């Protein structure tokens, strides 16, 4: 663990903050690269990224604080200290999507821009998990000798600094996000329905996050024994799955009839 990236003469830069910046830069470059390939104006995408980043980070932090209220009710001074780590991907996705859509809808189709942002979001989330690993947030449950997956254990601290063999939850999350980014990037040249990549990303990542929730050791709100973040993952997965099915069932647009001039030319 290395929560402090750089420190000099009272100035401290956290590793989590560095990972956030790197994730934003890498995700932006990935989305812009795909936008150029599709001949979409870069300024349009950058405006959406800016709106998504601002609303997404605010929503993600608020969501994380609410989910982990058991900790923050006794550490209220840390709520605004974003650089210490702690973002909810579910709240960030909702807030970021709303921000991007509000900007992108001025030049429809808005979902086309969200498709581009999904590629960058996957890469950005990967850096976010690395930041969580370095800052000991979203840590894994303890593992004990004799348990089936003890061979995966790493010595890692929890939010209170207690180091024990734990699930490598943050590293698994980073690997899953990176895998999704590679899948979206390598298939970017195929023909996609507008909105398909966005919903596919949400479905795939929320499924992985739901499964990963069983390995997390941070104390969060629960409902009927289920972690609140897993409940949100399940809701996002269901929503994305319904959207994908609707896209699949949507009839392709009928071919347009030839223009009158073209029809006359063909008859002559």
Where are these regions (language model features)?
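A feature for loop-to-transmembrane-helix boundaries and adjacent hydrophobic helices
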Residues: 1-268
